[in-house]
Amino acid sequence: MTAPPSSSSSPSIGALLGSRAGHLAMAVLVVELLAGMQVYLNQTVLPLLATEMGARNTYGLVTAAAQVPAFLTMPLGGAMLTRWRPARLMTALTVLLVVGAVVGALAPNVGVYVLGEILRGLAAGALATATMGVMVAGLPDAWRRLCLAAGSGMWVVAALAGPVYASGVSASWGWRWALVAYLPVLIAARAVMATQIRDLSLDEETGRDEAVPWLPALAMAAGVALIGALRASNPWFWPGVAIGTALVLWSCSRVLPAGTLRLVPGRRAGIATLLWVCAFFLTLDFLVAPSAHDVLGMTPTQTGWALTAGGVGWSVVAIACGARPAREPEAYRRRTTLAAVFFVVGATLMVITVLGRPHW
């Protein structure tokens, strides 16, 4: 791997606008912002496309369509960087991502839309890993630290801009335009990255440090696909959920440090706790848009505000807790207890609101 370039410029506004490292860092942050916005875009658009296509019973399939390919290609990102020049690789993957988005926007039915999501997921998974590799290999230490710190802030901005963009464009021009209107910005950011890393190359020794976890990745993808593909009315739904969950847990046990899922005291228990908290939160978060649209009859704008509230709360609290970690046991217990109370109260309010609808 070529060594990270030395830079005589330290991070500053002038260097951000006028140096190679600054341009690359800015492009990385824009891509991070768009990745965050994509999460809210998918959630906002999901009930709209399902209603138009008469496919409300395929929420699980549509949601899994982009995630399953991403699980498969994420482990490949690093290996790809050692076989092809990063600039060419990122250009090819960006083209695939754009094609997937366009296919989804032009889809006449949910089957074609799922095909577009699969293409986009294949590209997005590899791009996520490749972008991190490019940041590590292509930026000096000071700029790398800046990107890592600012990346967290980008998710706060994404929580504000993502739902506003998705709901605004969907309400004004339709959900199909929402899937593609942001693409020129993405293409421009990726083009800047490709230009700034055109001379960057990684040798094959980088990819030999650790074997690609193919089997766990396949098990994870298969588990998520199985859960998402089965409809609730299918008699095999619950057996499929059980098998899919078992596959996901097994893949986690192979990837995570030994003892994590058994809650071995110490850092492993902390990782497991974080895993389960994220799983429960994201599960509820995926239900916000369909429930808001299908059950509560909210408009895209109102749904966007609901998604913004959760996203901003998550991002702001994460940054605040990261800046001031609870180092003492008492402070940690106090903080986690308060978080658990907020989580239970919020989830309870959501359930009561949905179940309180007469037709539900």
Predicted regions and their residues:
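Small-residue hotspots at the loop-to-helix junctions and early N-terminal turns
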Residues: 50, 54-61, 149, 300-304, ...
